[in-house]
Each structure stands twice: as structure tokens, then as C-alpha cells.
Amino acid sequence: MKLFILAVGHKMPGWIASGFDEYTKRMPPELRIELREIKPELRSGGRSAESVMAAERQKIEAALPKGARLVALDERGRDWTTMQLAQALPGWQQDGRDVAFVIGGADGLDPDLKARADVLLRISSMTLPHGMVRVLLAEQLYRAWSITQNHPYHRA
């Protein structure tokens, strides 16, 4: 199984890339993380947030791996603990489907994409920069894996 992070946004600062890379390189080969950046739509010329999100949805759908479990990150999603994520990972691995975590653009994710998600997940109750979400998600995926392996990284 492969873990994909599809993120609307590009040209992240170096510290974001370094933080993200730090956790992705720690993952085992059977749970590799692949980042797919989606170029954000411009909000110029009076375009509505709805039209921007719809255009970004099309780009996201084109980048989604076929048959992947869709986990959409949204501020109104379910609030999982790290332990809940760790409990989900083995089941996801057993069913063999790749998992795609989707981080929307500045306006969020298109409602149609959120409606078809297998899981709608909130990563924090706080508002975070999109680049930081990449790092936090990669860290939580590594932490969840470490829990399943009784690795000493997670000590809580």
C-alpha cells in the first residue's frame, strides 16, 4: 500500500520541504509516502470560491490514484486521535488499496469531493498554513506506523 498526499499549493518554503522529507524518509518501503502537488487556481477576475474549488477538484481527481481510499482533510471533518489513525492503518494495509490524503487550497475542498470521501478528517481545530499541514500529516502517519510496530518514537 502506498500513501499519497495530494496538496493544492506549490512553491513551499524550504523548511516545509525539509520537515516533510524528514518524516517521509523514515517510513518503511511498504508504506511509502508520495506527495503530489496540485497547482492552485487563481482567484482573479472576480471568480467565485465555488468555481475555484470546482476547477481544483478536477485537478485533484486527475491526480488521484485509481481505486485509492480517499481521505479528505477538512475543518469540519472527524477529529481522530493519533491512536485512531494507528488503528486504521493495519486495516487499510490489509485491504490493499492505496490511500490518498487530500489537502485543499485556500478556499478548501469542493463539496462534491468531500461528499465522496471515504473519510472526512480534521487534522486540527486551529487554522494552519497549508504547508504546515503537509508536515503534520507526514509526522502523524509516521507516528501511527511507529505505534503499530511498538517503535519507541511514540511514548505517550
UniProtKB/Swiss-Prot annotation:
Enzyme class: transferase
UniProt: S-adenosyl-L-methionine binding residues: L73, G104, I123, S124, S125, M126, T127, L128
Coiled coil found in the keyword field: no
Tagged with keyword Cytoplasm: yes
Catalysed transformations (reactions): pseudouridine(1915) in 23S rRNA + S-adenosyl-L-methionine = N(3)-methylpseudouridine(1915) in 23S rRNA + S-adenosyl-L-homocysteine + H(+)
Cell location: Cytoplasm
EC number(s) reported in the record: 2.1.1.177
Alphabetized InterPro entries for the sequence: Alpha/beta_knot_MTases, RlmH-like, tRNA_m1G_MTases_N
GO cellular component, one term: cytoplasm
Molecular-function GO term, any one: rRNA (pseudouridine-N3-)-methyltransferase activity
Assigned protein family: Belongs to the RNA methyltransferase RlmH family.
Protein's recorded name: Ribosomal RNA large subunit methyltransferase H
Organism: Burkholderia cenocepacia (strain HI2424)
Primary gene name: rlmH
